[in-house]
C-alpha cells in the first residue's frame, strides 16, 4: 500500500522525511513567489502549487491567494493518480502542518497509508478537496474546556 507524508519545506533539501523510493511523487506547496526547495531524494514526479495558508473564515486582500477549486481538483487528480499507480507521496508546505497536512489527510481518506506526523489541516483545502471527491467535510469543533477538565481532573 502506498503511503503519504506531510513535512516542512526545510525538510525537503535535508531529506528529513521518508525516502519515497523510485516510484514516488513530491507535491510542493509554497506561498506565491515563494522559494521552492530542491529535494535531496529523487522523485519520479514533482508538482508545484502556490497558495497561502488561508482558512475559510479569513479575509485576504486578494482572494486569488486562496487555494482555488481548480487547484483542489488537480491535487485530488494527482493523489488518485499516485494511489492508482502505487506511488508514495511526500507533500510539503512552509511549516508542514496545515496546507500539506490537509492534502495528506485527504490522501489518507483515499486509501494511502498514514505516516505519523502532526497535522492541523487547513479547513479550506480540506473542504475543497473533499468536495471534489464527493465526500462530506465538517470543520471539527474542538472543545478546549472539556480537554482542560480532563487534563486537570477538575469540574467546573
Q: PLM features: residue spans?
A:
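A phosphate-binding catalytic loop at a beta-strand-loop-alpha-helix junction
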Residues: 89-105
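Generic beta-sheet signal
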Residues: 24-26, 87-91
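Helix-loop module immediately N-terminal to the HCX5R catalytic loop
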Residues: 47-89
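Short, glycine/charged-enriched secondary-structure capping and boundary segments
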Residues: 40-43, 104-108
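Glycine-rich, flexible N-terminal cofactor/catalytic loop recognition
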Residues: 1-49
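Short, amphipathic alpha-helical segments
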Residues: 69, 98-101, 119-123
